[in-house]
Amino acid sequence: MKVSYHGHSVVKIETNGKVIVIDPFLTGNPKTDLKAEDVKVDAILLSHGHGDHVGDTVELAKKNNAVVVAPFELATFLSWQGVKTHPMHIGGSHEFDFGKVKFTQAFHGSSYIDEENKTITYTGMPAGILFTAEEKTVYHAGDTALFSDMKLIGELNNVDVAFLPIGDNFTMGPEDAVLAAKWVQAKTVVPMHYNTFPVIEQDPYQFVEKLQNCTGKVLEAGESITL
């Protein structure tokens, strides 16, 4: 399994001949190395409905005939835009032909904001994502605060790599993310959701230096690890 980071919260997984992308915020993302028109994908996994996570989902899904796996309300909202979806909810899991997906808790918000019409559409609860294939598990925490049930994620799952937000302001900051890493018990921890905007500027190298009992790895956009 090849796992690549592409800036902000964009993660690409290549496994068993399939390509899965999590939270494909590409257009307007100053930290990504990808262009939406160049991306080939079989499945898109979404943690929540904010624009910096849904990103180019509709375009990518339609162009590639890819299924979008998302929390129920967000999946329904996207299905109304002509996208093929598979709705799920927190605590539920499903075996797809590309791997197993399970949604976990996340403490954040989830909505579609229409700036032009000044409306906000509720898109369900935010989530973290556990993805398992080839006997390897990736945990993408989505946007979240620190919460004590991260201990359960670590106890119930053998997490090979965890992507944790460290940007602060909208999510947990580096200090809380260090504790999250301890609780999740991942073998490798990769920081995400930082330095995309001024308000979430952080030093990822300082973060990984504080990690204990795991390997911290800063991935630049386009870099990957093999599990």
UniProtKB/Swiss-Prot annotation:
SMART domains associated with the record: Lactamase_B
Lineage per the UniProt record: Bacteria, Bacillati, Bacillota, Bacilli, Bacillales
Protein name (record): UPF0173 metal-dependent hydrolase BCAH187_A4741
Segments traversing the membrane: none
Taxonomic superkingdom: Bacteria
Entries under NCBIfam families matching the protein: PRK00685.1
Keywords (A to Z) from UniProt: Hydrolase
Molecular function as annotated in GO: hydrolase activity
The organism of origin for this protein: Bacillus cereus (strain AH187)
